[in-house]
């Protein structure tokens, strides 16, 4: 019979551990924060999804913003350079970000995603000079634990015209009772409005870190 309680003794009883999931306003740091987290300007909860190209990304601590450049054409968000990610938490996870897409060009995308092989995303883009908010996803090809084989195309579920280049985007993920679903919302007319459908998430070996929330920009 398994024990209900197991006592362990820490080898570092005075150590302070920072959370794996937390908010960040990317604002100016004091010397103690810089000592703890390094010099680039992020808390330790953030991780790059790929090997970064640091000349294409800037943390403007004075303005409290993260500035990304779209200098590489990508097939979809999984190829985006400099995507930064955090873990998601059980049983539910809610994340918000404000995207300022004033400098976006036709064909660029900037926003937030639930990053895995069968990803879901909401992003600001521009088409023929018109600013749009879109919700896109990549659906499961098969029920194997192996990842998609690249035979499916990304689906754009909804696109809405937006007047302002500054848009609040919200991600809500539900992991309770193996629901494993995510939806995206945007702030308009003093309320949150859903864009696109709930998207089904899957754990597969192509992204063995599970599902992470990501901030991205790509062309």
Predicted regions: what they are:
Residues 1-219:
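Extracellular glycan-recognition regions
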């Amino acid at each position: 019979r398994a024990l209900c309680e197991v006592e362990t003794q820490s080898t570092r009883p005075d150590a302070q551990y920072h959370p794996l999931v937390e908010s960040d306003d990317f604002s100016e740091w004091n010397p103690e924060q810089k000592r703890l987290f390094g010099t680039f300007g992020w808390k330790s909860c953030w991780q790059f999804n790929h090997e970064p190209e640091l000349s294409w990304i800037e943390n403007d601590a004075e303005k409290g913003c993260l500035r990304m450049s779209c200098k590489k054409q990508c097939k979809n968000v999984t190829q985006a350079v400099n995507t930064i990610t955090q873990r998601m938490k059980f049983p539910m996870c809610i994340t918000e970000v404000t995207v300022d897409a004033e400098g976006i060009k036709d064909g660029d995308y900037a926003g937030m995603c639930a990053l895995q092989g069968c990803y879901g995303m909401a992003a600001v883009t521009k088409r023929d000079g018109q600013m749009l908010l879109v919700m896109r996803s990549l659906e499961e090809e098969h029920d194997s634990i192996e990842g998609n084989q690249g035979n499916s195309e990304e689906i754009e579920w909804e696109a809405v015209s937006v007047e302002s280049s500054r848009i609040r985007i919200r991600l809500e993920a539900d992991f309770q009772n193996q629901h494993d679903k995510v939806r995206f919302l945007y702030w308009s007319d003093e309320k949150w409005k859903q864009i696109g459908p709930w998207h089904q998430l899957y754990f597969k070996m192509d992204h063995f870190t599970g599902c992470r929330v990501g901030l991205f920009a790509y062309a």
